């Protein structure tokens, strides 16, 4: 069977930037585990805040965490209370000084993470998987995407045998390196087990001269 390379990993260094911007030699493994802990903690704490990408930069005993979110108000909280509490928890988790940047995603329908999360939450609320995918595709195309492809895998409608079913509209040129393709996968916890949701969104071409660190803005 044909296997597909990760669309974002294939474009890193060409039209996409790294989500972790630091260099280390002996401390590499420690920093990597710390990055994973930060990402897991933030996604758990801000599960309802429409968090997409988490970028991490490092200096000496300092960690800069950039959160791309469609709901910046929810992340910041009243008078900055939520973001201050999050910063304090991350300081305790890492033992370092953590600085948090909040970047608003102005067009969430062009962000694969948020579209996939929306489909997954609908599946958990027992919305039909075909309907959830088709509605997401319509919203994304209306938002200005050149193409979108979605796929839901697992025990669809509670079937005994797991299968995959997907839909697409427009073009999604996975082999074109200058094509700005956002990709994400999410999980939906249903009464019949987990369903996997994959989303590919083609947002147009990006020339290597002007790298797109995070689209949808």
Curated annotation (Swiss-Prot):
Record carries keyword Thylakoid: no
GO CC, alphabetical: cytosolic small ribosomal subunit
Residue ranges of domain KH type-2 in the record: 38-106
Top-level taxon in the UniProt lineage: Bacteria
Cross-referenced SMART domains: KH
Key words of the record: Ribonucleoprotein, Ribosomal protein, RNA-binding, rRNA-binding
Chain ranges passing through the membrane: none
Database matches in InterPro entries: KH_dom, KH_dom-like_a/b, KH_dom_type_2, KH_sf_prok-type, Ribosomal_S3_C_sf, Ribosomal_uS3_bac-typ, Ribosomal_uS3_C, Ribosomal_uS3_CS
GO MF annotation list: mRNA binding; rRNA binding; structural constituent of ribosome
Keyword Nuclease: no
GO biological process: translation
Family assignment from sequence similarity: Belongs to the universal ribosomal protein uS3 family.
Job description of the protein: Binds the lower part of the 30S subunit head. Binds mRNA in the 70S ribosome, positioning it for translation.
Record text on subunit structure and interactions: Part of the 30S ribosomal subunit. Forms a tight complex with proteins S10 and S14.
HAMAP family referenced in this protein's UniProt entry, alphabetically: Ribosomal_uS3_B (MF_01309_B)
Protein name per its UniProtKB record: Small ribosomal subunit protein uS3
Organism: Streptococcus sanguinis (strain SK36)
Designated gene of the protein: rpsC
